Amino acid sequence: MSQTLRNSLYGGGDSHIYYDLSIQNNDNAGSAPVPLVFEEIRSNPYLTNPDDYMMTVARFTLDTPSLPQWIPQIMTGQANVNKTVYSITLQYLGFQYQEYLLFSPSDLSAPTPAVPTTTQDLSTSYYYGMSYTKVMESVNSAFLNAVAGLNALVVLPLLTAPFMEFDPYTYQCILNAPQTAYASSLANPIKIFFNTPMYNLFSSFNSTYLGYTNITNGKNYQLTTYTNNNTTTIGGVIYLQFYQEFSTIPLWSPIQSIVFVSSLLPCSP
């Protein structure tokens, strides 16, 4: 690791002292990540009375792929380390089937976490979600499994499953549902429900809140699948498209703050 240090003084007097620090990792060997460490040994102190000063990080930029974009909540009290609390429920003619999302890890080098008997094991980076596309894959797998599960209970008018996609330009998600089976204008449409944890991830979809009292199989929110002019045809199937009204991606971030702690960081007047 090479370090390029530049300290400079802006403005007049000693009331505002700015220290610019740039640290670069020039490792081209593709080895394991190098810990960021700043260490400097000096024979004379920069400040004779450091207690007279207060320090703050005015601004910083951090380019790192190691910060997770989301960390799923895993269901406790069961043996599957990838089974989350987020569920999709499909209902047709009074029959219903609930399917939970399964987490797909991005870091295959992390050890498998302990079984979530009572708590979720967050001691490693196993649950660090690094891709929004992987979330869409989990959602779409849940839709496929829900369609198959419901069709085992009652013959469905169409076996083509809804699917969700992520728009990287708007950071909004789009739900696509086959018009001939899911349009709310049909006499007997297939209905889509999210449980509360699932809805919290995608809360800007048009939906109806059904509450908690006497609610079974995660039917807390019913998505509104009305016929509109937003359609797309894929493989001969006409899909209704439902857009999020605003992006909920910022709500997914598990990062609350980045804290700088140091008792040896010098300030140069």
What is each of the regions a protein language model found here?
Residues 1-269:
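Flexible assembly/topogenesis modules
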